[in-house]
Amino acid sequence: MRKSLLFVWACMGLVCLMSACKTSVKSKEWKLVWVEDFDQKNSFDESVWTKIPRGTSDWNNYMSYYDSCYAMQDGNLILRGIANHTQKNDTAPYLTGGVYTKGKKLFTGGRVEVCARLQAAKGAWPAIWMLPEKAEWPKGGEIDIMERLNHDRIAYQTTHSYYTHTVSYTHLTLPTNSRV
C-alpha cells in the first residue's frame, strides 16, 4: 500500500514538474536546446509528448491514459494522482498521469531548464528524469534532475549507471511551497 501511494504521488509530481520555464537565463557556456510552455488549450503537444503507459516498475505501475489524470491550465500541464473509484474495469487502486518525450524528442547536449510546482503528500514521488533513448536501464544510465519523496523538503539529484548504479548523489533543501 505504501509503495502504491508513493508511486501515485510520484506521478502527480511529474505533472507538476513538466511545466517548463517561461523565461530562461542567458549563458555563454550553455545553449538552451528546447522550450516547452504548454500553451496549448486542451491537451499537450502530442507530436512531442506521450502519456506514459502502465508498466510493472514501481514508477509506472499506476500510469493511466484516463483524461481525469491530465489537464492543461494557464500554460501548465497538470498531472494528477487519484484514487480509482470510477474505473471499474481497471483493478489499480490508484491512477496517475505522466508524460515523456520517448521516441519523439531527443537531447544530445545543451542546457535543460524546468519550472515545476510540487505538491507534498504521503506517497508522492514527483520526478524529472533524463533517460536513454535506446539503451535499457540501467545500462544506458539515468540523470535524476529532481526527485522528491512524500513530504520531504529535499529535492534529490542523482546519476545512475550500469557500473556503479549510483554515481553521485546530492540534495537541495527546499523552502516551503517552493518552485523547483
What label would you give each PLM region?
Residues 1-27:
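Bacterial Sec-dependent N-terminal signal peptides
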Residues 23-172:
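GH16 jelly-roll
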Residues 171-180:
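Single conserved hydrophobic/aromatic residue that forms the stacking wall/gate
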